[in-house]
Regions:
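Accessory interaction regions appended to the cores of large information-processing enzymes
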Residues: 1-183
């Protein structure tokens, strides 16, 4: 139900499962440029009504362990927005960004610029990166898929694949495809 609430405001009343509201407050504030106020009240228990669709894009997964390099991240920006900053420690299987397509992509954020002894009159320009997506615990829980986990430490919230090894992930994916084909 939608009705006026005075002072150029609207009041929306709707029923939604709690699992569907995880991560929605941040999205609502973004959509309304911080002007929305959200209040939740328990209405009733209800039977399961089906899956709630999550994100549709894949993720960018680190394929090496080490410190992220700004130059490598700059070269990979066209693949999708990053969730890490240069200098962050990454490991194999860690999610470092969101892919622009619907599949997961293994990337190397450690590859530095090839240096030469040749000097030029034009200096190398400083790499300018798009600010990374900041993950809060609520946002991370809403973001992950079934094959992903959230790591919470006192200093950071990180996302990773359940299976860190890419070969294990491919094997598991093939096994699931075989199960659905026989079912």
């Amino acid at each position: 139900e939608m009705r006026p609430s005075g002072g150029n405001r609207l009041r929306l009343v709707f029923y939604a499962p709690t699992r569907g509201l995880i991560g929605y407050q941040g999205e609502l504030l973004t959509d309304t440029r911080g002007t929305a106020i959200m209040n939740r009240l328990f209405h009733a228990y209800a039977p399961f009504k089906g899956e709630i669709t999550g994100r549709r894009n894949g993720v960018l997964i680190s394929n090496e362990q080490g410190d992220a390099v700004a130059y490598a991240m700059w070269k990979l920006e066209d693949r999708g927005p990053m969730m890490i900053e240069p200098g962050w420690k990454v490991y194999r299987g860690m999610i470092v960004g969101e892919h622009t397509r619907d599949n997961d992509l293994e990337i190397n954020v450690l590859k530095g610029k090839q240096l030469t002894n040749i000097r030029t009159t034009s200096k190398d320009e400083a790499v300018r990166l798009t600010p990374p997506i900041k993950m809060t615990l609520e946002k991370a829980l809403a973001y992950i898929q079934d094959d992903e986990l959230v790591e919470v430490t006192p200093k950071s919230v990180r996302l990773r694949k359940k299976l860190l090894d890419p070969n294990d992930r491919k094997r598991e994916e093939r096994r699931k495809e075989a199960e659905t084909a026989t079912a």
